[in-house]
Regions:
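Bacterial N-terminal signal peptides that target proteins for export
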Residues: 1-8
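Hydrophobic helical h-region of N-terminal Sec-dependent signal peptides
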Residues: 9-13
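C-terminal segment of classical bacterial N-terminal signal peptides
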Residues: 14-20
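Extracytoplasmic copper-binding redox domains, predominantly the cupredoxin/blue-copper superfamily
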Residues: 20-233
Length: 233
């Protein structure tokens, strides 16, 4: 069965819903279309000394088989549940935020590190949560914060270095994942039931809600998606 949304394609292939192991949803996100080349980012002289590598935008990170990284995948209608384990860590390293995409549960504390010998500032610009803007000295103490409202995605920037961005998915349960460099994802510990699963890619979907598909978990399930590059205006 195939569902088409504006600029998006969901591929729900026959047999893509499979029982595997208890409590997991696994899948793969692939990109349809050829993205434009990433743009090179000119660094300041001080950042160029810290990071001598070529730095580019990260709009579409795709492997040789079309696997799409940095997709935030989550259950839209899962019941609220507390976080399991420690919250994520966002690092400023080589004058870049790492990782580019990360996720957190509402109320869960996350940390921001500065591993650079360079002043940065951490400036999330949420629409539903409380904004903050804090300087962080070179190799200084971690910043620890949390967000109280579900929001996909919260932009985090550095006003000192305008090319530095990261994006955080905030949901009220731990049933989410970010695709790896091959486009694979795994959501663990999911209770049995029917869900709407969402795959959201920042560049492809923008203000759109992402690609959605319904699935039923009985022990575990598999769900693949295809994300289509939007047509040029």
């Amino acid at each position: 069965m195939k569902y088409c949304l504006p600029c998006l394609t969901v591929a729900a292939l026959a047999g893509s819903l499979q029982l595997v192991a208890a409590g997991e949803i696994t899948g793969k996100i692939t990109l349809k279309g050829t993205p434009k080349p990433e743009l090179e980012i000119p660094l300041t002289p001080s950042c160029g000394k810290i990071n001598p590598n070529k730095v580019t935008t990260r709009h579409y990170v795709v492997d040789k088989d079309g696997g799409l990284a940095n997709v935030f995948v989550y259950l839209k209608d899962a019941k609220a549940a507390p976080a399991t384990g420690e919250g994520p860590v966002l690092d400023q390293k080589g004058c870049m935020y790492e990782p580019y995409i990360l996720g957190v549960v509402t109320g869960q504390k996350f940390k921001v590190k500065n591993s650079d010998p360079e002043l940065h500032n951490v400036h999330p610009t949420p629409k539903l949560n409380k904004e903050f803007n804090l300087g962080q000295i070179p190799n200084g103490p971690d910043i620890t914060r949390s967000f109280d409202q579900a929001e996909v995605l919260v932009r985090i920037k550095c006003d000192v270095h305008p090319w530095m961005f990261a994006y955080m998915g905030v949901v009220d349960h731990p049933y989410f994942a970010i695709t790896d460099k091959e486009g694979n994802f795994k959501i663990a510990g999911v209770p049995d039931g029917k869900y709407t699963i969402v795959a959201y890619h920042l560049k492809a979907h923008g203000a759109n809600p992402g690609v959605t598909q319904t699935l039923e978990v009985k022990g575990s399930a598999k769900q693949d998606f295809t994300v289509e590059i939007p047509a040029a205006p």
